[in-house]
Amino acid sequence: GNAVGETASVTADGTGWEGWNRRMMSFVSHINRQDWTETYGLNVVVEGTRAPLSTTEIGSYMSRLPKDTSETRKNIIRYALQSVGKVPYYWGGKASAQNYTGNNFGSVTLPDHKGRILKGLDCSGWVNWVYWSVTGTHLPYEGTEGLRTLGRQVRRQDLKPGDIVVITGSTPHVIMFLGFTSNGQIQCVHE
């Protein structure tokens, strides 16, 4: 699923279990440790969708944007943050339509290379979908390599909120730049 920096799997109480009591947490942990194939004959795939960000969390991220951030960039970032936890990660997944309607996110589909079965988006598909949904313009490339050739390289200090960052190497990835943390680490929104 989508994530914001390192905080995506942590809810307001700091544990990732907001609203759960110890008995329920223990029960869920027990069930997750079971071998479902051996015990029940079921092949269970753990999906990577996280809890959506709260309105307060989204507001907090938005309030940290530089004052000169354009309305379009603000809308792109807000939409990206609002999608956290709502779109499953699915390798090779691309959007069929702008916004949520027509994409059937979360419906069962053929397994991807890691066995994920819920329809969703991969990192480059997610970035393209966010931009398409907000601006009405479908980026000319949907894959990581295509997005790399689409843009131009900028220096780290010249990154602006909403910029697409393509990470190359043996495990390529696409993220949306949000800002820098107080210790200079990149904070991003990603699939």
Predicted regions and their residues:
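Alpha-solenoid helical-repeat scaffold
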Residues: 25-26
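Generic hydrophobic, helix-prone segments enriched in Leu/Val/Ile
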Residues: 1-2, 80, 89, 147, ...
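N-terminal capping segments
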Residues: 30-124, 132-137
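...with weaker cross-activation on analogous glycine-rich loops/strands in unrelated enzymes
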Residues: 128, 132-191
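Cationic-aromatic interfacial patches
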Residues: 1-21
